[in-house]
Curated annotation (Swiss-Prot):
This is CMP-sialic acid transporter 1. The gene is CSTLP1. The keyword Membrane applies. Pfam families: Nuc_sug_transp. The chain crosses the membrane at residues 3-23, 34-54, 76-96, 101-120, 127-144, 158-178, 199-219, 234-254, 263-283.
């Protein structure tokens, strides 16, 4: 499968995630425990990967699987990073409003590029660096409200701790992505075997988060497994399937492409969500959204277009004999 087909599908699924999540609400509230969504998505990814790993093991040429603990334990790290990131995310939102947090989240685009260079030793050209910065500018522009709106007034009025936590959140998100790419490419193990290790720890940590929530609430609603499917509808299951499928596509890109492609896919997905929201939820289209889309398209072209298509090479002069 070509990487650009996977990237396009990831863009569609990313844009669908926010829309499906909104549609799963009833009167602006969730009837289900939204903390169960990541757990079920991890369980779906683990089941999917386990099935196809089993299919590979039944073939005439068994897949390569590194089973030493010193290798397996490395797959624990992304789950730890995401656990820290989730806590930092909640802490950040106590200091800043959601709009400011979303705008600061675009810093992960640039930090991904920096870690891409430092950790994976992948060099970007000057033009590609400009494209990455433009992508961050474009996505930020699309999310900025009009200067007469409250979100615009509050953008620079948050406490200093809020901005520091927002930067830390962006760095942790980028670090998790870059580290996952390092894991996927460090050997020639089967993608499904790598996924099984990654998602096993994901299931364990998400289950631990649900148990922690029960203890924190004093088991007022009973243990998490008794209310696991409470309030679930067809739309809710679509959210689970969408989130799980998105994770599987991301792991494919980490293995066979890179983090920058993933960043472009998810960023374009966010822009597509905004455009679709104009038609589905009567959200007002803004000049900022239009300008952000234009900037991101220019960035996309700058990053992926071959150099010989960007510069018209001079034609060789005909040789004349004297």
């Amino acid at each position: 499968m070509q990487w650009y087909l996977v990237a396009a599908l990831l863009t569609v699924l990313t844009s669908s995630q926010g829309i499906l999540t909104t549609l799963s609400q009833s009167n602006g509230k969730y009837k289900y425990d939204y903390a169960t969504i990541p757990f079920l998505a991890e369980l779906f990814k683990l089941s999917f990967s386990s099935f196809f790993l089993w299919k590979e093991c039944q073939s005439s040429s068994p897949p390569r699987m590194t089973k030493e603990w010193r290798s397996i334990r490395l797959y624990l790290v992304p789950s730890v990073i995401y656990l820290i990131h989730n806590n930092v995310q909640f802490a950040t939102l106590t200091y800043v409003d959601p709009s400011t947090y979303q705008i600061m989240g675009n810093l992960k685009i640039v930090t991904t590029g920096i870690l891409f260079r430092l950790v994976l030793k992948r060099k970007l050209s000057n033009l590609q660096w400009m494209a990455v910065v433009l992508l961050a500018v474009g996505t930020t522009t699309s999310q900025v409200k009009g200067c007469g709106d409250a979100p615009c007034d509050s953008l620079f009025s948050a406490p200093f701790q809020g901005y520091m936590l927002g930067i830390l959140s962006a760095c942790l998100s980028a670090l998790a992505g870059v580290y996952t790419e390092y894991l996927m490419k460090k050997n020639n193990d089967s993608l499904y075997w790598q996924n099984v290790q990654l998602y096993t720890f994901g299931v364990i940590f998400n289950m631990g988060w649900l148990i922690y929530g029960d203890f924190k609430a004093g088991f007022e609603r009973g243990p998490w497994w008794q209310r696991l499917f409470n309030g679930y509808s067809i739309t809710t299951w679509m959210v689970v399937f969408n989130l799980g499928s998105t994770g599987l596509l991301v792991s494919w890109l980490m293995k066979y492409s890179d983090n920058i492609v993933k960043v472009y896919s998810t960023s374009m997905g966010m822009l597509l969500t905004m455009v679709l929201s104009v038609y589905l939820f009567n959200v007002r289209a803004t000049l900022q959204l239009f300008l952000g889309i234009v900037i991101c398209i220019i960035s996309l072209q700058m990053y992926f277009m071959p150099v010989n298509m960007l510069v018209e090479l001079p034609q060789a002069l005909p040789v004349t004999s004297k």
